[in-house]
UniProtKB/Swiss-Prot annotation:
Involved in the biosynthesis of solavetivone, a potent antifungal phytoalexin. Catalyzes the successive and independent hydroxylations of premnaspirodiene and solavetivol. The first hydroxylation step is 3-fold more efficient than the second hydroxylation reaction. It comes from the Eukaryota. It is found in: Membrane. It is a single-pass membrane protein. This is Premnaspirodiene oxygenase. The lineage of its organism: Eukaryota, Viridiplantae, Streptophyta, Embryophyta, Tracheophyta. It catalyses: (-)-vetispiradiene + 2 reduced [NADPH--hemoprotein reductase] + 2 O2 = solavetivone + 2 oxidized [NADPH--hemoprotein reductase] + 3 H2O + 2 H(+). One of its GO terms (molecular function) is monooxygenase activity. The gene is CYP71D55. SUPFAM superfamilies: Cytochrome P450. GO terms for cellular component: membrane.
């Protein structure tokens, strides 16, 4: 029975392939970018087997060029792998590539894509991005969370200090730090279901970052059920939804009674969104689901990506002891004799900033960015990009291109000393947070959760590898997923540092 079902599916897919080929026969004059050979039904999918997507696509681009076409099942896709082509997509023709493709996971976990990251381009997206930039993640709001960051960093330092007799799972502790930091910023306090919630969010992000064959055959709705992915995502999402719904309703109740929700007395992120909901006057009134979608974006961008950046920074410094010593010396000289310091003081640490810049060059949080979708037929470099084409920018490859970076694969923070390259998408060879209209709106929030903990950990502890390990033994293997996190947990031994009081 199962055999006949598979045969039926194959025949049906074959029919769709022939039908699509017939429909597209009148557009053969369109000159698509070059790309690898294609098979019926699967298109270019076989070329993606056997490696991490951003690695495979970089290697294919070496053969087919910086603007490359792939046929992924039913989906037409273009991959950008040079600063010039990235500028065409993210600046010159930004409006034409400002939308997002429809994918299963964001449709579910982002409440029909009513978030910011996966929302299709239009008036609703413009409204919510404006709210995010001016209210939710404004510089003022990010600064208002400084006491929460200070408290969470203190917890992290105290945990490491209590574990100095054995190796610390650096990866695990930093994920818990960024998760707790985001929880308290969003919800105002540590809540009773926080640990369960953090694990559920981690599960949902993992599922959302997985490959689902139904996304490359969007016309075949039954594949979502057949692969089982929809059920897995729905199950985890319902649990997350119930927890956040309770938190929102508790906030509404407290506000109605004149109580503050944040343990520190200020507005948390839900308070901000509820205030805007109650004020009215918006073209698209905010609902509970809209709030939950924005909160999911916050956790997706503020936990996995920040903790991954911290881990990669430490991995690279442990592999390069001279760089570790230089970063540590800077922190300890700047705060000599102090027991602690806050994030305003971290502004003085110029070399630490270079370390983070170099970390993001080699390990951008989302190596292919969130994919864009072509809204109107566009010509780039003499090639036609059809409407609905999925566009991926390989920022991992851009950051390692030897045409633009000397000794591109090696970790050298000093390369940025005399370099004006920044994070905000103006330099197309360096786009760790994207560029154009869809650049990540949470850059300030994310970096604030990276600088302070890293500076504190370098200040308070001397670090070494577990017995028997050498710096060269630290591998750089990445996980498969939306984020390029390190595959193996980083285990380190910490020795408390006693600052001189002279």
């Amino acid at each position: 029975m199962q055999f006949f079902s598979l045969v039926s599916i194959f025949l049906f897919l074959s029919f769709l392939f022939l039908l699509r080929k017939w429909k597209n026969s009148n557009s053969q004059s369109k000159k698509l970018p070059p790309g690898p050979w294609k098979l019926p039904l699967l298109g270019s999918m076989l070329h993606m087997v056997g490696g991490l997507p951003h690695h495979v696509l970089r290697d294919l681009a070496k053969k087919y060029g910086p603007l490359m076409h792939l046929q992924l099942g039913e989906v037409s896709a273009v991959v950008v792998t040079s600063p010039d082509m990235a500028k065409e997509v993210l600046k010159t023709h930004d409006i034409a590539f400002a939308s997002r493709p429809k994918l299963l996971a964001p449709e579910i976990v982002c409440y029909n894509r009513s978030d910011i990251a996966f929302c299709p381009y239009g008036d609703y997206w413009r409204q919510m991005r404006k709210i995010c930039v001016l209210e939710v993640l404004s510089a003022k709001n990010v600064r208002s969370f400084s006491s929460i960051r200070r408290d969470e960093v203190l917890r992290l330092v105290n945990f490491v200090r209590s574990s100095t007799s054995e190796p610390v799972n650096f990866t695990e502790r930093l994920f818990l730090f960024t998760s707790s930091m985001t929880c308290r910023s969003a919800f105002g306090k540590v809540f009773k279901e926080q640990e369960t919630f953090i694990q559920l969010i981690k599960e949902v992000i993992g599922l959302a970052g997985g490959f689902d064959v139904a996304d490359i055959f969007p016309s075949l709705k039954f594949l979502h059920v057949l692969t089982g992915m929809e059920g897995k995502i729905m199950k985890a999402h319902h649990k997350v939804d119930a927890i956040v719904e309770d938190v929102i309703n508790e906030h509404k109740k407290n506000l109605a009674m004149g109580k503050t929700n944040g343990a520190l007395g200020g507005e948390d992120l839900i308070d901000v969104l509820l205030r805007l909901m109650n004020d009215g006057g918006l073209q698209f009134p905010i609902t509970n689901d809209n709030i939950k979608a924005i909160i999911f974006d916050m956790f997706a961008a503020g936990t996995e990506t920040s903790s991954s950046t911290l881990v990669w920074a430490m991995v690279q410094m442990m592999r390069n002891p001279t760089i570790l010593a230089k970063a540590q010396a800077e922190v300890r000289e700047a705060f000599k004799g102090k027991e602690t310091f806050d994030e305003n003081d971290v502004e003085e640490l110029k070399y630490l900033k270079l370390v983070i810049k170099e970390t993001l060059r080699l390990h951008p949080p989302v190596p292919l960015l969130v994919p864009r979708e072509c809204r109107e037929e566009t010509e780039i470099n003499g090639y036609t990009i059809p409407v609905k084409t999925k566009v991926m920018v390989n920022v991992w490859a851009l950051g390692r291109d030897p045409k633009y970076w000397d000794d591109a694969d090696n970790f050298k923070p000093e390369r940025f000393e005399q370099c004006s390259v920044d994070f905000i998408g103006n330099n197309f060879e360096y786009l760790p947070f994207g560029g154009g209209r869809r650049i990540c709106p949470g850059i300030s929030f994310g970096l604030a959760n990276v600088y302070l903990p890293l500076a504190q950990l370098l200040y308070h502890f001397d670090w070494k590898l577990p017995t028997g390990m050498e710096p060269k033994d630290l591998d750089l293997t990445e996980l498969v997923g939306v984020t390029a996190a390190r595959k193996s947990d980083l285990m380190l031994v910490a020795t408390p540092y006693q600052p001189s009081r002279e």
